[in-house]
């Protein structure tokens, strides 16, 4: 993008983001929209285009694997997609992160990242699978809105200046599980950036439906040690407009009575603004 100014022409480079598509990923349109609202130049790219080298991660700063049901969750949610990435794109993804890129996994994308071993990333370069997202304790698929608390001590780039947020979840395999020693590491290293909470912001303490899946320690999202690789089960891209919230009519009237402006953006956009803003 070229601008004219008093000192002549100058070029402003927008932050480029790649949203991966294909094989059952189905949240790419709303994810792309959220990134565009946040100020990124977005391209939706099929996995096969990356594998065939028709496209590369090199020109991009943000790489998103969004929600969906890749390969129909066969063999477990995110397993086959992770294997495809591991055998064909592992070195490229590692180089992308090593040179400062941001990787975001949302819902199915989070499942992919933990199966790939990119998260939790205790030892850079190992890509070792140390955590899992398994079947919900309730025994079925959950589609609901949840309250989330954000860890202010986390170094995750997505959660900067956010303390609590409401977002939708929709998954059948979202229970975060790991051995006690791994959980202790995650918490001690401030890699847990998002937890399920009660509406008043207090910890969910595994209570259903506030913790909708039985996640250990109410964990809803984690990042790696750099803070630039992050995964979460809730869908920030599904709260990209004020009217996405199930109680938007209540809040609209509330804001009117309080003399407050009615927002247009949904709060989920904050995560994407933080990702784009990291490079600005």
What residue ranges belong to the model's regions?
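N-terminal beta1-alpha1 cap of cysteine-dependent amidohydrolase-like domains
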Residues: 1-106, 110-128, 134-142, 216, ...
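Amide-donor transfer/coupling interface in amidating biosynthetic enzymes
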Residues: 49, 53-55, 93-95, 128-280
């Amino acid at each position: 993008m070229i601008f004219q100014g008093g000192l002549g022409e100058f070029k402003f480079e927008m932050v480029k983001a790649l949203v991966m598509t294909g094989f059952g990923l189905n949240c790419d349109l709303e994810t792309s929209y959220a990134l565009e609202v946040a100020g990124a130049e977005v391209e939706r790219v099929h996995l096969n285009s990356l594998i065939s080298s028709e496209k590369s991660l090199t020109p991009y700063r943000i790489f998103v694997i969004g929600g969906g049901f890749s390969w129909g969750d066969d063999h477990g949610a995110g397993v086959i997609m992770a294997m495809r990435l591991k055998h064909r794109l592992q070195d490229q993804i590692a180089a992308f992160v090593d040179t400062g890129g941001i990787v975001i996994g949302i819902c199915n994308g989070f499942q992919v990242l933990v199966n790939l071993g990119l998260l939790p990333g205790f030892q850079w370069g190992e890509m070792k699978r140390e955590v899992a997202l398994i079947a919900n304790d309730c025994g079925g698929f959950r589609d609901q809105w949840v309250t989330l608390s954000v860890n202010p001590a986390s170094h995750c780039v997505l959660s900067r200046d956010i303390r609590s947020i409401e977002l939708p979840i929709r998954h059948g395999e979202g229970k975060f599980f790991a051995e006690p020693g791994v959980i202790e590491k995650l918490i001690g290293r401030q890699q847990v950036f998002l937890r399920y909470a009660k509406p008043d912001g207090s910890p969910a303490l595994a209570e259903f439906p506030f913790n909708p899946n039985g996640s250990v320690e109410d964990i809803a999202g984690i990042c790696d040690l750099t803070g630039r690789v992050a995964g979460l089960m809730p869908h920030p891209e599904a709260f990209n407009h004020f009217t996405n919230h199930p109680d938007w009519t209540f809040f609209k009237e509330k804001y009117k009575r309080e003399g407050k402006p009615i927002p247009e953006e949904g709060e989920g956009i904050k995560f994407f603004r933080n990702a784009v803003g990291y490079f600005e």
